[in-house]
Amino acid sequence: MWYFLRDTLYSIVFIGVGMRTSGKLWIGKSAGEVIQGENSFDIIRYFLSFAVLVGHFRVITGIPYYFPMSSVDAVHGFFILSGFLVFYSYMRNPDIRHYTERRTRRILPPYVFIVTLCWMGGVLVSTLPVGEYLFSAQLWKYIAANYSFLNFIEPALPGCFQGEAVNGSLWTMKVEILLYITVPIVYYLMKKYRPFPVFIVIFIFSTLYNELFYYLNEKTGNEIFGILKRQVGGQLLYFYSGTLVLLCFDYFRRYIKFLFPVAVLVCYFRYDVPLLIYVEPLAFAVVLIGCAYYIKWFVFMRKFGNVAYGIYLFHFPVIQFSIWLGINEKSHILCFAFCVVGTLLLSVLSWLLLEKPILSNRVFSSK
């Protein structure tokens, strides 16, 4: 235990002092080996995506399906993985143009696809006549709001799904984009002022942000404060917890056998033991990235395209469509199977026909 505490203290001091070699921000040497080599990030993405799918299926249909992780935790998990992988990607090539192009190619095509599919498909499920639907002010408000990632302005389509949100998963996209925007800024600040003080400022700010809007929500009962709590200020904790593990990866790898069970206990008892909730983001990052590092059974999945992003984007409207068809009234199991198969089918088609060609530079190439 003494050696662990000693070396952990050394690692904190090491990061606090900072290390600049050839003008590059320091990173754990083994992090690159794990990211580019054998890891199970793909299966973790699938697990998180299905956690969100099951969570939304349960809420929308009222059918009590169980999954070992809540949709809220799954969203936090996605932010952690982004903080680890996206920050690493930027550190390898800190060119703004390259970074922007890579992020745009990854997130924009399937997003535009599902928004377009929803408002065009709305013609078929809307209770309004086609002409009234197409010239509805609500439709054009939906189109403008959703193409600009401001989904909260108009989440519903005219006459569709009894006025409920068409795709309740899209709210995280604007948060994800804003987190991406912070990466070059934080990278610059870490190079200038060293990582440790920058992490401290980020974690303190995000914690205070969460506490403020949690208090206001509890005090006033106004849900707007709960919504604000979930925005980018509150998610910085999770995103940069992933980044912190990245920068400390050599130490993380050395002490994973001790850190992992401690992190699991922190996550499990976070609501029961005071103060644990404040270190839960970092503990969750240790658990997720530890699983990616240690679980080798699913390494083979790296050979195939990952459609987890598609599952996340497409499942919500598929669930709404299944309700519109009335499948849930006939069989809960059939309804769930329809949602899973329909979501997977859309995700695979999107990957093969849209995402993969764009990512491989076969379309929209800048060359």
Regions found by a protein language model. Give the residues of each.
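Functionally critical transmembrane alpha-helices in membrane proteins and complexes, commonly lining
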Residues: 11-14, 18-20, 36-91, 108-111, ...
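Short, Lys/Arg-rich, polar N-terminal cytosolic tail immediately upstream
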Residues: 1-2, 17-37
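Solvent-exposed interhelical
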Residues: 177-206, 246-258, 328-332
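Aromatic-anchored segments of alpha-helical transmembrane domains
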Residues: 50-58, 202-215, 262-273, 314-321
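Interfacial loop-to-helix transition and helix-capping segments at the boundaries
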Residues: 2-11, 36-39, 64-75, 161-175, ...
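Juxtamembrane transmembrane-helix termini
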Residues: 20-27, 71-106, 110-133, 318, ...
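Alpha-helical transmembrane segments of multi-pass integral membrane proteins
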Residues: 3-18, 264-356
